[in-house]
């Protein structure tokens, strides 16, 4: 597995360099807009909480930990304002699903690092259970590639984005190709959604990558492209097939 990882990196950097030189992919002009002012919507406690408890990952493969702990702390805060936030180390010690902690190590679990979409969903469910948090449902959604604009999967995602932004009745954790959204490597990545503007159809990402210093906004089409990207076949050996999202319906 280490040999395979070493072979993947040159390919990823060559693809990154190509997009940078040609101005394609996420290097196209006006594709990403940085959000400089934090969002504090008093009418939407859940949205306010996810912005407050959003944290950055502690190393290159731990985007799942930062994303899940951000959501768990946001949900916990709604029931008890005095709740002390859970740390990323705490949740890794408490939730052992899928050898989560081992997957965050340098060598990974049997050479596998990070969490594919189905395993991310299991980790979210077990994290909610571990901290005795009741939600209506947890939905693991794969986003098929080459869907037309009227596909039910796209329509449902837009509906859930609107519901989150207007009413705060659910959180969305995206599992996406990061290089489709921002100028970086085309690798599987995980981060929570922070907002959705239904008028402009733009999605705000609370990216847990510490290199993304501020939240950023992309069009819904760009967001969906990142979700529906079939990860390069070299990632299949590590369990990564395609992207999608986890929807935590809280009410």
Enumerate the predicted regions with their spans.
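Cysteine-nucleophile protease catalytic domains, especially the papain-like/related folds used
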Residues: 17, 27-152, 239-242
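Polar/charged alpha-helical tracts
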Residues: 2, 6, 89-93, 155
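Short amphipathic alpha-helical patches
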Residues: 70, 77, 229-232, 247
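Enzymes acting in ubiquitin/UBL processing and closely related pathways
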Residues: 2-25, 235-251
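Short low-complexity stretches enriched in small and charged residues
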Residues: 18-29, 90, 157-165
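Conserved active-site-adjacent core of cysteine acyl-enzyme catalytic domains
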Residues: 95-188, 194-227, 231, 235-243
């Amino acid at each position: 597995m280490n040999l395979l990882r070493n072979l993947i990196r040159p390919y990823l950097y060559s693809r990154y360099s190509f997009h940078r030189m040609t101005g394609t992919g996420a290097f196209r002009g006006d594709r990403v807009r940085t959000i400089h002012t934090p969002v504090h919507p008093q009418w939407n406690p859940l949205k306010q909480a996810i912005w407050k408890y959003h944290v950055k990952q502690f190393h290159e493969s731990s985007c799942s930990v930062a994303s899940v702990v951000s959501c768990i702390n946001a949900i916990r805060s709604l029931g008890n304002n005095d709740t002390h936030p859970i740390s990323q180390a705490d949740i890794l010690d408490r939730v052992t699903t899928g050898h989560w902690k081992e997957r965050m190590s340098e060598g990974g679990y049997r050479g596998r690092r990070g969490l594919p979409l189905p395993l991310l969903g299991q980790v979210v469910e077990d994290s909610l259970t571990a901290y005795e948090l009741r939600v209506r449902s947890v939905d693991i959604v794969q986003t098929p590639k080459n869907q037309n604009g009227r596909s039910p999967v796209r329509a449902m995602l837009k509906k859930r984005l609107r519901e989150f932004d207007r009413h705060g009745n659910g959180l969305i954790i995206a599992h996406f190709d990061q290089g489709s959204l921002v100028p970086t490597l085309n690798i599987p990545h995980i981060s929570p959604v922070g907002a959705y503007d239904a008028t402009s159809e733009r999605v705000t990402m609370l990216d847990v990558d510490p290199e993304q210093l501020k939240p950023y906004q992309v069009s819904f089409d760009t967001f969906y492209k990142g979700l529906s990207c079939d990860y390069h076949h070299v990632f299949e050996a590590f369990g990564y097939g395609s992207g999608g999202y986890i929807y935590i319906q809280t009410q």
